C-alpha cells in the first residue's frame, strides 16, 4: 500500500510542496527568504489578529486603544512591538528576496516573478494602511500626503481622493475603511502566495550557478526543511531581540503624539522601507510626474524579464552586470537615506541624480551590459 501522504488528495499537495519536492542541491541561504516571508506573514496575521481583538477603529479612541493594548492587555506591549517590528523584518526579507531574484535571474520564470511583484504591491499597500491605524501624528499626516497623490490623476483626481477619504479630509470614515483593508489584505496576500508557489513548482527553483539542475536534485525534506527551520530561528531571535530591547528604534517619534489635523509635523516621512520610493516621488518637481515615477519605481520590476539580453541567466559569471547590480543596491541605499532628509540643498540634487540613476540602470545600463557580455563571451 502506498504512503497516505502520496495518495490523500490534500496531503499529496502538501507532500509535493514540502516533502518530496525535488530541489537543486546547491541552493544557498539566499533561497531561504521565500520561507522566511511565509513565516513573517504568519506571524503578522497572528499578532494582528490579537491586536484587532482590542483595537477600536474610531478617531476618538484609536490612539487610546493602542495605549490600552500596551498597558492593560496581557503581553499586549509584546504583541504590538512584534507586529510593528515584524513589518520591518517582512520588508527586509522581501527586499533581499527580490535582490536574490535579480542577481540569479529568477525573474526569467515570468509568471512567478510577476505574481511576486503583485505581492510586493499588496504588502506595501497593507503596510501603508496599517501605519495609519494607531492614529498618531505621522499616521494622520502620512495618510493625508499619500492619499492626496491621487488628486494628480487628471479629471477624476479630486473626486477619487474624496471617495477614498469618505469625506473632505482624512477622518473617521478613512480610519474605519483602512482598518477593514488592513484586516482583509493579508488573507489576499496569503492566497497570492499560494499562486506564487504553484507557478514556482511548475518550473522548480533556480540555483547559484544559473545552470540547469535537473541532473542534481535532492528532496526538500529533510535537507531544506531543516535549513528553513534554522532560518526561522535566526529571524525570530532577531525579531524578538528588536521588539524587546529597542521596539521604537525604527518608528517615528511623532507617532507617539495623537493625530492633530491643526499641527503639521516638521518633516513628514514614511517608515524606512518606503523611503527609497518616497525620495523618487519627491525628486520630480511635478505632482503627476512624481506619482508616475513612484508607481514606475516598483512596476519597473515587471520589465526586468523583458529587458534581459544576456545569454547567461545568473550574474555569477558576469562581472560587468555584477558591478551594475551592486551600483543599484548602493543607489537604493542612497535613495533611502535621501527619503528621510529634509527637502533642501544638497539633498534635492542628490535625490534627483539617484532617482535618474535608478531608472537608468534598469532601463539602459543592465540591458547594454548584457549585450556587451554576449560579445565578450562570443
UniProtKB/Swiss-Prot annotation:
Binding-site residues for heme b b562, renumbered to this chain: 83, 182
Membrane topology: Multi-pass membrane protein
CDD domains in the cross-refs: cytochrome_b_C, Cytochrome_b_N
InterPro entries per UniProt: Cyt_b/b6_C, Cyt_b/b6_C_sf, Cyt_b/b6_N, Cytb/b6-like_sf, Cytochrome_b, Cytochrome_b_C_euk/bac, Cytochrome_b_N_euk/bac, Di-haem_cyt_TM
Keyword Electron transport: yes
Keywords: Electron transport, Heme, Iron, Membrane, Metal-binding, Mitochondrion, Mitochondrion inner membrane, Respiratory chain, Transmembrane, Transmembrane helix, Transport, Ubiquinone
Binding, heme b b566: 97, 196
GO molecular function terms noted in the UniProt entry: metal ion binding; ubiquinol-cytochrome-c reductase activity
Cofactor section: heme b
Gene Ontology biological-process entries: mitochondrial electron transport, ubiquinol to cytochrome c
UniProt: a ubiquinone binding residues: 201
Function: Component of the ubiquinol-cytochrome c reductase complex (complex III or cytochrome b-c1 complex) that is part of the mitochondrial respiratory chain. The b-c1 complex mediates electron transfer from ubiquinol to cytochrome c. Contributes to the generation of a proton gradient across the mitochondrial membrane that is then used for ATP synthesis.
Note: Heme 1 (or BL or b562) is low-potential and absorbs at about 562 nm, and heme 2 (or BH or b566) is high-potential and absorbs at about 566 nm.
Family: Belongs to the cytochrome b family.
Binding partners and assembly: The cytochrome bc1 complex contains 3 respiratory subunits (MT-CYB, CYC1 and UQCRFS1), 2 core proteins (UQCRC1 and UQCRC2) and probably 6 low-molecular weight proteins.
Descriptive protein name: Cytochrome b
Source organism of this protein record: Hypselecara temporalis
